[in-house]
């Protein structure tokens, strides 16, 4: 948080003098200063925990909430929805939600796109995490889970993105080990999914058997 009173520039005093010369008084009691707070960062608070079926997951080891996540407790089954994209453009059609109902469920999606290495790809503008979250939210998902491609190791950092905090549904990034553990319930792995989608250029989606995820997210 930033308190404007802690650093008043000289130009402010000049402006106040000019306003007074026109007979204009302060709008905030006896002062021309209007204090305000802005968010410049984000951090984990005390109530962050998760349970996958009956196994506890460790925050910052097995998963990490993302800065645009909502806070609260969310529990539900898990479905996998490819890259989490819903694109209907003249030059590109791709809908990872066409064959599944994600309402009131956790939707698990892979980061990036089938054309990750192509900076001019038509997928690029649809691939940011917060955009995939908005698609999931609009589809009625209870929350969104991001998993990494084979090229990525480790969890994403919890870093503040202006304008995207508390965007409506919980959003987390799972570790590679936990992601593969969940996918194995249906005979899949991150490698098999990524290679199949990228080779066929077709979405893969499915309901994940016998999987209930409960996550409490507490961000400040």
Where do the model's predicted regions map?
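Noncatalytic luminal/extracellular "stalk/propeptide" segments of secretory-pathway proteins
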Residues: 1-114, 218-220
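Catalytic cores of large soluble enzymes that bind and process phosphate-bearing ligands
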Residues: 3, 7, 124, 128, ...
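Sec-exported extracytoplasmic/periplasmic mature domains
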Residues: 16-25, 41, 84, 137-142, ...
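Short, solvent-exposed loop/turn segments at the edges of secondary structure
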Residues: 74, 102, 139, 166-167
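Long, well-ordered, tryptophan-enriched scaffold segments
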Residues: 142-148, 162-164, 168-220
């Amino acid at each position: 948080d930033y308190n404007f009173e802690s650093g008043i520039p000289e130009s402010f005093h000049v402006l106040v003098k000019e306003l007074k010369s026109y007979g204009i008084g302060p709008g905030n009691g006896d002062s021309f200063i209007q204090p305000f707070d802005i968010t410049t960062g984000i951090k984990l608070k005390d109530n962050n925990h998760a349970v996958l079926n009956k196994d506890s997951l460790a925050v910052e080891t097995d998963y990490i909430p993302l800065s645009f996540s909502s806070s609260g407790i969310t529990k539900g089954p898990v479905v996998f929805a490819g890259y989490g994209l819903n694109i209907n453009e003249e030059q590109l059609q791709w809908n990872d939600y066409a064959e599944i109902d994600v309402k009131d469920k956790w939707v698990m999606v892979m980061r990036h796109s089938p054309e990750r290495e192509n900076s001019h790809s038509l997928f690029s503008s649809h691939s940011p995490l917060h955009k995939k979250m908005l698609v999931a939210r609009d589809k009625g998902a209870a929350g969104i889970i991001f998993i990494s491609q084979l090229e990525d190791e480790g969890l994403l950092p919890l870093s503040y993105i202006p304008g995207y905090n508390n965007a409506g549904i919980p959003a987390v990034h799972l570790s590679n080990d936990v992601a593969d553990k969940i996918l194995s319930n249906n005979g899949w792995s991150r490698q098999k999914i990524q290679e199949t989608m990228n080779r066929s250029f077709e979405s893969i989606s499915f309901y994940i058997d016998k999987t209930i995820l409960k996550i409490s997210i507490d961000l400040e």
